[in-house]
């Protein structure tokens, strides 16, 4: 986790200590102003590609938001178009993750089929937490957690919602993840791209 103040211009954020790394997922949140979004960037989709974690909106491109992933952190632009990650004098927090099978974290993309699909991952272990989001269309943040219920593959949560756990076979196809794949069902629309 990194806490900092925005400066409204190009701002290279250097991670140090336990976080001395190139992050592959950066989650930025304004700490001081109410009503601002959770901003999510990752190295698989590429810098400037933003998805708001608390909303169902499709992916957006903001050329002056998070502009690069660096070997020791990331760079933010002036943020004039989004206004949620680097406004001058505003206080922010950024959570950072490194994609690594050893660390138990993987980022994958896939295109939905509207039916049952096995999605490959590179963890070599059964995922305990899966978060999915459509990139090319609006849609829910379907979330799986291995400790959610006695049969978590039958249930889901939504990251963008405060609803309780729901039971619906169209999300995970009532199929537990394995050491090489997780399964999605018809809730993942045909030709829609997902992360």
Role assignments for model-derived ranges:
Residues 3-195:
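Surface-exposed molecular-recognition determinants
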